[in-house]
Amino acid sequence: MQVSDFHFELPDELIARYPQPERTASRLLQLNGNSGELNDGQFTDILDLVQAGDLLVFNNTRVIPARMFGMKASGGKLEVLVERVLDEHSVLAHVRCSKSPKPGTMLLLGENQEHEAEMVARHDTLFEIRFTSDKKVLDILDEIGHMPLPPYIDRPDEDADKERYQTVYNKKPGAVAAPTAGLHFDTEILEKMKAKGVEFAYVTLHVGAGTFQPVRVDNILEHHMHSEYAEVSQEVIDAINATKARGGRVVSVGTTSVRSLESAAQHALKQGTELAPFFDDTEIFIYPGYEFQVVDALVTNFHLPESTLIMLVSAFAGYENTMKAYEQAVNNKYRFFSYGDAMFITKKTA
């Protein structure tokens, strides 16, 4: 398939630049993967769509304030976007400035250039940066970093984004983009689901800035995915096995949860073993033709045209079903992308 097969026209006004006043106030487009049937509704309808015995799998990564501003010690402004925390004092980052810094270049980061760091090495398009102080990287980021809003939101981050560009169940810091399907859940709706007999499990996938990189080839088979770190614990494996045994569904909240679960499944298939814990980097690329091993239903936002995420949705719901759903979403003026509305999709099995 060609990347252009996943194109759709999106009016600029449908890109959500701010979240709704309440997390659960978004709309929800339901898509039945087998029949192609579409239903417009509200996000709170999800309480009727999940059933006792289902397992919801969330990504509990925490978005770090990964964007820093500063200058080279020799002069010249720069912007640093952390891609990955390497250890307590070092990061891998994208650096934007007029001239790329060479190894050994000293950087002064923060509004008042209060934190000194050294550009240690370059790895392709990323720079390894080491802070010289005894403070831990995550503490420095909390002090001087800005929330790394996606480029299409097209505005500076605000104080409210520290809360709203973060799930209510976030736990493990490391992401530089939110697992956005989870943004629709507040504590009240989670409690209602639990009361209904729905079970929860948590994976971790630290979403990288690569998630916003465009696909730069024409044929999707030539695309190479960026790498992200994922964790699927034994506790999650046990919950999945118990759910399948009782006839429940594994409902993935977000594409990052899908990629975590299916990475574990693919690893097990290659090893010739049962589903097992997975703690590793993943470059899994899911596109039409992929056979899902774990996930039965999916909660997800509306994704960018020609992105790997709309390809994943097409693999799950069927290509034609997905493109029709997106056409309906545009016609019915759903809000798109990170702060936008959501879909609830059941897997195409036939």
Curated annotation (Swiss-Prot):
* Subunit record text: Monomer.
EC number of this enzyme: 2.4.99.17
Q: Which GO terms describe its biological process?
A: queuosine biosynthetic process; tRNA wobble guanine modification
| Pfam annotation, one family | Queuosine_synth
> A single GO molecular function, which one?
S-adenosylmethionine:tRNA ribosyltransferase-isomerase activity
Please verify whether the record's keywords include Transferase. Answer: yes
State the InterPro entries in the record.
QueA (IPR003699), QueA_dom1 (IPR042118), QueA_dom2 (IPR042119), QueA_sf (IPR036100)
Q: What is its main location?
A: cytoplasm
Assigned protein family: Belongs to the QueA family.
Q: Which reaction does it catalyse?
A: 7-aminomethyl-7-carbaguanosine(34) in tRNA + S-adenosyl-L-methionine = epoxyqueuosine(34) in tRNA + adenine + L-methionine + 2 H(+)
- Under which pathway is this protein filed? tRNA modification; tRNA-queuosine biosynthesis
- Natural source organism: Aliivibrio fischeri (strain ATCC 700601 / ES114) (Vibrio fischeri)
The domain of life is Bacteria
Q: Any idea what this protein is called?
A: S-adenosylmethionine:tRNA ribosyltransferase-isomerase
Which Gene Ontology cellular component terms are annotated? cytoplasm
Q: What does it do?
A: Transfers and isomerizes the ribose moiety from AdoMet to the 7-aminomethyl group of 7-deazaguanine (preQ1-tRNA) to give epoxyqueuosine (oQ-tRNA).
Instruction: Give UniProt keywords alphabetically.
Output: Cytoplasm, Queuosine biosynthesis, S-adenosyl-L-methionine, Transferase
* Annotated compartments: Cytoplasm
